[in-house]
């Protein structure tokens, strides 16, 4: 058990480092989106379109479910799968995208159709894999085959506390970008390419 503890603490440290390495990019991207929306609040884009005219039962909802590849993670996988199952039952007009062996086995055993299985090991995420996954999902959204896209995953708050999250990825909500107007807003320059 001491060896298992050392291995798990090593994996936790590695995961924390990977998270801290990607957070600056994520927060900078959010900041830039906020900046763009400050200057062009009425921007129209397919990525902000909400399809409010469509009845909720007619909306095609995509769910990206992220689980582990192995089952030695306590409630980590159980809670994600439980919430995913609830969402799928609530929205029968859905498409399911699964990352992780446990998720694949769970849905296959229950006869739930998986739109796309991404056969990447979730223990070793890469930018290239993330790009491949996002390109496929975005293409379905752009074609109108998906009206909304959600991601269901477990967020590690600290070493002993985790929380299952469900977040809407598409369409983007302008309110999600904290659009605070800085003091020097009038002097702030913005160059967009291609221009809107």
Question: What role is predicted for each listed range?
Answer:
Residues 1-196:
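C-terminal beta-strand-loop-alpha-helix "lid" module of Rossmann-like NAD(P)-dependent dehydrogenases
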């Amino acid at each position: 058990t001491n060896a298992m503890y050392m291995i798990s603490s090593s994996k936790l440290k590695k995961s924390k480092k990977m998270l801290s390495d990607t957070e600056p990019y994520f927060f900078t991207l959010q900041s830039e989106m906020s900046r763009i929306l400050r200057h062009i609040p009425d921007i129209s884009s397919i990525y902000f379109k909400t399809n409010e005219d469509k009845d909720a039962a007619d909306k095609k909802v995509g769910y990206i479910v992220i689980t582990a590849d192995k089952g030695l993670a306590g409630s980590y996988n159980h809670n994600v799968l439980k919430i995913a199952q609830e969402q799928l039952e609530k929205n029968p007009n859905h498409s399911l995208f699964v990352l992780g062996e446990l998720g694949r086995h769970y849905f296959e055993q229950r006869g739930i159709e998986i739109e796309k299985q991404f056969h990447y090991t979730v223990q070793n995420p890469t930018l290239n894999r993330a790009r491949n996954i996002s390109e496929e999902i975005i293409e379905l959204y752009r074609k109108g085959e998906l009206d909304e896209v959600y991601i269901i995953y477990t967020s590690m708050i600290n070493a002993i506390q985790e929380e299952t999250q469900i977040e809407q990825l598409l369409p983007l909500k302008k309110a999600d970008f904290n659009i605070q107007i800085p003091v020097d807003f009038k002097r702030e320059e913005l160059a967009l390419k291609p221009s809107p």
